[in-house]
């Protein structure tokens, strides 16, 4: 399979629920809740409400089968947290069960916002599939997991693949495994928080040209401007972590946006979309009175 040239997906876009995601479509904004719910279903609902109020198109969670993703040795390591004294206590404490996701599903439906998850193992894909999500996310950490890629693709749902900490050769291979149909790639840098000099936003148009599929941006920086710049450079969707308070306990809060920040990102992206235009230079009707008032004409000197 050639990696170059436009595909049907890049021309038509990728359908996620009731939204078409791709070039010439409004940027699809994903609020990454991830594990910022801190294991509290009520906090998860508050974050969903924040995303709705900001105007986001979707919220995303993370799902892991802990004993599959982590070794017994890793889980036994000492680590203090509100859930206990080991790394395993922490990991298990941050996972929601089936009944929690039933609440999440019902709350998102009532709030009229899409939800899906990045699944870190095949059992988690099967678990989330019970809720019939509109798509799946594959995290940068899983880009080289061919079994997970194939299992996720087998659901028949669109796949959003993050490409942080990955070489072009590794991305090439992942695209070969997944196929280009109903695939969206996200440019990303996997440091938390990411430095601006690590963001390399010019990779977005390069990836669009190389792979011929819609390309978006997953940001882990602390500011807002670079996410808006990603949209200007052609990102078909953007993803940012959200939190109620960046000072909260937890590993991802510091690289997340608080409610006001998320609202500003969505607002600014929509304003930029209005501002881009079609590239045809024209004189607008509202400029006509200004022409009459200020336009200077060449007056010959006798």
Regions found by a protein language model. Name each.
Residues 2-302:
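Catalytic cores and adjacent flexible loops of soluble metabolic enzymes
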């Amino acid at each position: 399979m050639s990696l170059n040239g436009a595909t049907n997906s890049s021309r038509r876009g990728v359908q996620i629920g009731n939204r078409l995601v791709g070039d010439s479509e409004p940027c699809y904004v994903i609020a990454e809740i991830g594990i910022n719910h801190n294991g509290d279903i009520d906090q998860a609902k508050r974050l969903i409400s924040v995303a709705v109020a900001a105007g986001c198109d979707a919220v995303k969670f993370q799902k892991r089968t802990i004993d599959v993703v982590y070794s017994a040795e890793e889980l036994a390591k000492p680590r203090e947290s509100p859930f206990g004294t080991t790394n395993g206590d922490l990991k298990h404490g941050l996972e929601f069960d089936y009944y929690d996701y039933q609440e999440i599903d019902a709350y998102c439906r009532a709030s009229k916002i899409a939800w899906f998850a990045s699944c870190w193992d095949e059992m988690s894909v099967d678990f989330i599939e019970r809720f019939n999500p509109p798509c799946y996310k594959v995290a940068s950490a899983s880009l080289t997991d061919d079994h997970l890629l194939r299992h996720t693709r087998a659901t028949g749902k669109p796949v959003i693949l993050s490409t942080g900490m990955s070489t072009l050769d590794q991305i090439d291979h992942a695209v070969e495994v997944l196929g280009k149909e109903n695939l969206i790639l996200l440019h990303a840098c996997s440091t938390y928080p990411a430095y601006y000099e690590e963001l390399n936003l010019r990779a977005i148009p390069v990836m669009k040209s190389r792979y011929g599929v819609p390309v978006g941006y997953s940001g882990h920086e602390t500011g807002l401007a670079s996410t808006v710049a990603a949209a200007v450079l052609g990102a078909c969707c953007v993803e940012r972590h959200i939190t109620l308070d960046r000072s909260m306990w937890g590993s991802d809060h510091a690289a997340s946006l608080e409610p006001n920040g998320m609202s500003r990102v969505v607002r600014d992206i929509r304003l930029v979309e209005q501002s881009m235009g079609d590239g045809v230079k024209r004189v607008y009707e509202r400029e006509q009175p200004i022409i009459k008032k200020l336009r200077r004409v060449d007056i010959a000197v006798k």
